[in-house]
């Protein structure tokens, strides 16, 4: 310090002078200490108990409506202070009793250590790590989606109460898994817009909804990302930072937007994150139509819009969309961006204001959305231990119930793709089980990306060894092995009653910023599988751990390979779930949430083409089960059980008449479709109403209890480039052996049977619609 030098130079003074100087120094030190303590950053915002003077501030008055509290707070801030609340590491305002706040935390499938807002310690060393989202989606169980969200938010609140976590979580990822090579497909609920929408709203509700049911309060704040048409990370040199997704309005409204709409409209999500990429030449984080127009205008978001990390910087530096940083800051804020993950807005917004590019009122609007969210979370209500979730703590993390839910989620999601009758295995008939493969004894691989520290791990090897005697050999040093230990693996398999090969991928193969270039098994794994199958004494089971699918046609057609399981990235309890299914303690019920294509598909389809619909002229085959008609390795919805289910139609109309107004144009002309909105939709069934019911009797014809997902698909008339089929609904049912029950679907005619036309408008096709459940088909005619 500058004042210390003169004092230290006085060491030559007589003793009496030294004493006087010492007393002066001591008084100065005590004064400075008291002043520093008085000015130190508060721990909790509006902690009136610790600082009674804060009670005078309107924004600290919990009796007032949140909107009034927000307005009061914004009015008290300087421009520089306001700008400090535009960035993810928000500055505190000591004079108002507001601490700093880190917005960035993640909770994709459990509380994560990704993002600076959350960390683990000896107090809370780990949190429940659920399966990666793609496997949870394979359960097709909406109540499970919500239950997982509820556990994750409880553990997050418990960690927040002891200073280890934030309240704002930038999860879930609800992008459509459009291309099988995408490295982040593992984070998503799959390729179907309805499934993705159901997952989005279900998980968000689990995270956000409070026990008291107050819709204006949040348990934690979720964030649906990455808005929008984002599904290229790094493919053959094409990076997300510069990629321009060229998307038709039809595909935008039919495929890419529905999960985000469901997040906001059905899930009441508190936040949406805009993505790095451009859409049709505009950066998503600077597009007023996408942000202010759709998210906040049409969908009525009650919360904040945040950029992906450094997205505003990216649109300036990588995309060269603006000439200056100040322009980038201004157009993003004016487009509707409220918060910048990163520091860009903190560095350049003041210059944008001084240059007249953006006014202070726009900044007020942005930070008001941020404060609104924090107030709904109780951040401005003082010590969290005195609030609704104040009793939560470390003992509420990694509870036995939470860990069992993680295991059950993996069981429900695992998909049985092939079974020649070998499965389930009988432990009594197995003396030796060979466990081979690079993923057989992995830990971190099981939890995928955006992970946290799990409560504990149970590897596939540990799960299997808990039931029967096992011998183990990796066979490959890693999933991308250049050399496989074929000799050792075949020797092991040649003496075992059954051989289990646990293979697949990990984050070195598919991840954020890492897209695949082909659909082959990595490294020498295919050769390892082929040779083990040839040499094995007994049946061979293939367990595939991955986010995306592989072309495993060779294994599908190999008679020595008796069973194939896809287990996604099954989470901390993956080994338990795998063993439970292999040994028949759990009857598999998972269904693929994405198509598994042959290698030939990706050889002719660039990842950068965003079109969903096929183009006969160019030979482009289209994407996902809704439009692709070519050969598949395994199809969307595939998944076997240890029992057999059959379906019988009980109830469904054969004809629906849409009554039109007298002056409707289609009364005097040949119309192929009608707008999917209007009086004709509200009175579409006899007796009035907009919906009808489909009843399906489901019978379990086997001798084993089972859980079955019933899919209701529809094939609409061939108009407006309609899908070859699309999912109308799905229901899960548990049936005992030889038991039957009726599953009921409510079909909203103009919502569920409509298609999106070329300009993005929903239309209900006139003519023949085909409803189908499994092999069961029913024709429905819609006319005027």
Swiss-Prot record:
Optimum pH is 4.7. It holds the Pfam family Fn3-like. It is an enzyme of class 3 (hydrolase). GO terms for biological process: systemic acquired resistance; xylan catabolic process. SMART domains: Fn3_like (SM01217). Transmembrane segments: none annotated. Glycans are attached at residues 141, 441. It is found in: Secreted. Expressed in flowers, siliques and the apical part of the stems. Might be processed at the C-terminus. Belongs to the glycosyl hydrolase 3 family. Beta-D-xylosidase showing an optimal efficiency with the natural substrate xylobiose. This is Beta-D-xylosidase 4. The gene is BXL4.
